[in-house]
From Swiss-Prot:
Upper lineage: Eukaryota, Viridiplantae, Streptophyta, Embryophyta, Tracheophyta
Catalysis performed (reactions): L-seryl-[protein] + ATP = O-phospho-L-seryl-[protein] + ADP + H(+); L-threonyl-[protein] + ATP = O-phospho-L-threonyl-[protein] + ADP + H(+)
Keyword Calcium in record: yes
Organism: Arabidopsis thaliana (Mouse-ear cress)
Keywords assigned by UniProt, alphabetized: ATP-binding, Calcium, Endoplasmic reticulum, Kinase, Lipoprotein, Membrane, Metal-binding, Myristate, Nucleotide-binding, Palmitate, Phosphoprotein, Repeat, Serine/threonine-protein kinase, Transferase
Protein name: Calcium-dependent protein kinase 2
Residues bound to Ca(2+) 3: D572, D574, S576, E583
Main localization (coarse): endoplasmic reticulum
Lipid-conjugated positions (N-myristoyl glycine): G2
Residues given in the record as Ca(2+) 1 binding sites: D500, D502, S504, Q506, E511
One Pfam family here: Pkinase
Location of the active site: D310
UniProt xrefs under PROSITE patterns: EF_HAND_1, EF_HAND_2, PROTEIN_KINASE_ATP, PROTEIN_KINASE_DOM, PROTEIN_KINASE_ST
Length: 646
């Protein structure tokens, strides 16, 4: 699942001849447009004046290694971005005597999620900076001496770029915790795909017979601290986004002496990219539906403080091969946690989809909206908006090229669709639409209906649901939160730090008010005070770290049997199999809960009225909801984490 960048010898090796009429149609200069049967494309004024024109590759390349953050802003992109021809690569690799080469990624038929982690080779780790804006880099597209005729052929995905390892064998723990024995619970089946860091297999859960995908990441290939941190962060982000219907779900992470095993949902419907290839382009109605899904994931990510940084059709998989199959976002290997107004400088992504501010090394989550805009353009027309024969040429077009709305099929596409694409591909990120604004655009709305009000941020939504729970359930969630691994709550920890402005370990009313405002929540002070009091279980007047985690925890954590049993066991002090009023009173005292109204809590949960709570009654309370003032539905459509309200 992955297609790599093609180097300067692209014309000589015949790759450009393997284009398809349905996809990536080459555009020509203005002087040739009249004689073309397709009438394809406009080029920038600079490109039109040059004697030779750029040709487009037959499909977008895989993410590439881009310039380091220390590159002189005045230096052109080409020296950092140009990929050596194969024979030159081998010569370079031979000279690196102490380095290993990770095998190239191969094409796979139905990859549930590739281990195709793109690596930014640079002296510094990929950390955001808040320095003054650097000067834009200048690039010149390369030109060919002649335009070769196109021939119809099945497009082949180029092989992944080779990754040259540094040195050394890493033996310490990657997950930083002891895990259960993977082989006791799962057996591996056929190979689904090969990535840079590991291999993806079909995976069978022994206890249930359920099928999953398992990405086994070889520890010996994690040769730098950055490699290890990338793996940890990817797992953390997948846990953080868990529960969204269009994000691939993670079942668990395991580690043994040789590998990290990441067990995930199995998606067997193939890539969005492949369906675009088959169709040429989508109808507007279907394209709008897919755009809603893609941008909906973005809105969810951004509200949870996550920037994807590598959106492209290859990173979306269908659950099945059915026409109306659910679409899932995969591969968070380049994703990062971010804070409001944080500036990132490391250049990562894929050439056709990278935002101009990323190339200028000063960007934030707005760059994801640009990438989504490129995908929408491709869904509607079958070709990318900015293209050239070389990577350098692509970047020049991204920075300065003009959008083409004159070539087929754009004359037959609605003005509303064109308006959305224009607003998503504004080069100034401050003027670009946000993910939520895209969802409110008339072309994307469901049956022409926009949300009545801005979507609640994930933090606000979860706190609202938490505030509606009775104190017994709040305490149980606190127990579950304290039992979770660091990787499962790392995202919430980042959000707590963002709101806790003075780093006191306590969130005050003013800090909560400011934090909710930063993520787009517009609440009255009385409403914020209600949320504050609901989360402040021990009535201390502030929200401490553990209270915040419990109040913002996604309720999918309740579905796990081990979490439920651990919480029940905490209250069942004498291990009798029942929770008595005295045991519940003791727990309230431990949590500092005053005015607990023990009898009322018992009455709400004790279904058989025997004066005690058994395990089944406890599970029913946790899963169905037992809330002061009425029942609450806890399906995906009402999950207040990151589901979208229509």
């Amino acid at each position: 699942m992955g297609n790599a960048c093609v180097g300067p010898n692209i014309s000589g090796n015949g790759f450009l001849q393997t284009v398809t009429a349905a996809m990536w149609r080459p555009r020509i200069g203005a002087e040739q447009a009249s004689s073309s049967s397709h009438g394809n494309g406009q080029v920038s004024k600079e490109a039109a004046s040059e004697p030779a024109t750029d040709q487009v590759q037959n499909k977008p390349p895989e993410p590439i290694t881009m310039p380091s953050s220390k590159t002189n802003p005045e230096t052109k992109l080409k020296p950092d971005l140009e990929i050596q021809p194969e024979e030159k690569k081998e010569k370079v690799l031979a000279e690196e005597t102490k380095q290993k080469v990770v095998p190239e990624e191969s094409k796979q038929e139905v990859p549930p999620e590739e281990s195709k982690r793109e690596v930014v080779v640079q002296p510094e780790s990929a950390k955001p900076e808040t320095k003054s804006e650097s000067k834009p880099e200048t690039t010149k597209p390369e030109t060919t001496s002649e335009t070769k005729p196109e021939t119809k052929a099945e497009p082949q995905k180029p092989k992944h770029m080779r990754r040259v390892s540094s040195a050394g064998l890493r033996t310490e723990s990657v997950l930083q915790r002891k895990t259960e024995n993977f082989k006791e619970f799962y057996s591996l089946g056929r190979k689904l795909g090969q990535g840079q860091f590991g291999t993806t297999f079909l995976c069978l859960e022994k206890g249930t017979g359920n099928e999953y995908a398992c990405k086994s990441i070889s520890k010996r290939k994690l040769l730098t601290d950055e490699d290890v941190e990338d793996v940890r962060r990817e797992i953390q982000i997948m846990h953080h986004l868990a529960g969204h219907p269009n994000v691939i779900s993670i079942k668990g992470a395991y580690e043994d002496v040789v590998a990290v095993h990441l067990v995930m949902e199995l998606c067997s419907g193939g890539e969005l990219f492949d369906r675009i290839i088959q169709r040429g382009h989508y109808t507007e109605r279907k394209a709008a539906e897919l755009a809603r899904t893609i941008v909906g994931v973005l809105e969810a990510c951004h509200s949870l403080g996550v920037m994807h940084r590598d959106l492209k059709p290859e990173n979306f998989l269908f659950v099945s091969r059915e026409e109306d199959s659910l679409l899932k976002t995969i591969d968070f290997g380049l994703s990062m946690f971010f804070k409001p107004d944080e500036v990132f400088t490391d250049v990562v992504g894929s050439p056709y989809y990278v935002a101009p501010e990323v190339l200028r090394k000063r960007y934030g989550p707005e760059s994801d909206v640009w990438s989504a805009g490129v995908i929408v353009y491709i869904l509607l027309s079958g070709v990318p908006p900015f293209w050239a024969e070389t990577e350098q040429g692509i970047f020049e077009q991204v920075l300065h090229g003009d959008l083409d709305f004159s070539s087929d099929p754009w004359p037959s596409i609605s003005e509303s669709a064109k308006d959305l694409v224009r607003k998503m591909l504004v080069r100034d990120p401050k003027r670009r639409l946000t993910a939520h604004q895209v969802l409110c655009h008339p072309w994307v709305q469901i049956d022409g209906v926009a949300p009545d009000k801005p979507l609640d941020s994930a933090v606000l939504s979860r706190m609202k649901q938490f505030s509606a729970m009775n104190k017994f359930k709040k305490m149980a969630l606190r127990v579950i939160a304290e039992s979770l691994s660091e990787e499962e709550i790392a995202g919430l920890k980042q959000m707590f730090k963002m709101i806790d402005a003075d780093n006191s370990g306590q969130i005050t009313f003013e800090e909560l008010k400011a934090g909710l405002k930063r993520v787009g929540a517009n609440l009255k002070e009385s409403e914020i005070l209600d949320l504050m009091q609901a989360a402040d279980v021990d009535n201390s007047g502030t929200i401490d770290y553990k209270e915040f985690i419990a109040a913002t925890l996604h309720l999918n954590k309740i579905e796990r049997e081990d979490h439920l049993f651990a919480a029940f066991s905490y209250f069942d002090k004498d291990e009798s199999g029942f929770i008595t009023p005295d045991e519940l009173q003791q727990a309230c005292e431990e949590f500092g809960v005053e005015d607990a109204r023990i009898e009322e809590m018992m009455r709400d949960v004790d279904q058989d009225k025997d004066g005690r709570i058994d395990y089944n009654e406890f599970v029913a309370m946790m899963q169905k909801g037992s809330i002061m003032g009425g029942p609450v539905k806890m399906g995906l459509e009402n999950s207040i984490s990151i589901s979208l309200k229509h």
